[in-house]
Amino acid sequence: MTSVGALIGFGQVRHARSRPRAHAFAYPTFFLMLPMRSLRAQGDGALARNRRAALAFHDRDHGDGRADSLQWLDETLAAQGITDASGEVWLHTYPRVLGYVFKPVSFWYCHAADGALRAVVAEVNNTFGERHCYLLDAPRYGVPATADKVFHVSPFCPVRGEYRFVFLRTQHGAEDRTVARIDFHDEPGAEALIRTSVSGTLEPLTEASARRALWQHPAMTLGVVARIHWQALQLWIKRAPFFRQPAPPADFVTPGHPSPPVSTPL
């Protein structure tokens, strides 16, 4: 990708549950896509970082809460033996809106010096104030990557089974799009219990695009939290199984399963 400035995405969040009763919803959203290494080197005047603004990004909303989230990321990668992700790191995340933030999931796309995707860190938050990360080593765009589910997110989903992640970043002419899909399989061989995705078209973050985002979604953070609880009520009415919150995992980072080897033609 050639752009080194902060981007903003306008798109949709989708969620579908297959059983015991079908349940699905979709709603419009916006998000940030931030080139973290470039921002460290040169900043971006359009991005309010670590300061008050109607739309802002704060490092301490990520990782272990330190002032430099990129430093945390590099240390996390190194602890898992990944020392060659020295290229750009694109962070797909929700901003603070009017001082409030809730980020169900953020994605750190970590590239090698040659631009190849080296790792992805999926940073998950639940409504109980807990956070956990899934680290996918050597994933490939468009190819499923998996990790065991070890972290409680919803009282209507068990902490077992695995996540299957698929990531896409495509450019067609001037259009730059991103897609992140997560399917949750609670039982081996069964269809996915949950299918979720967030997708959008990216454009430069400017004062005009930020105003448009705030005009279209003036209370996005509150809306995200309200929708989570509204959908939980719908599942309770439909008598979806209820699971109590377990203790969080001992380790803050869960490594994903090894990616399948790349097949080469004979």
For the regions a protein language model found, what residue spans apply to each?
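Mature, function-bearing regions of proteins
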Residues: 1-266
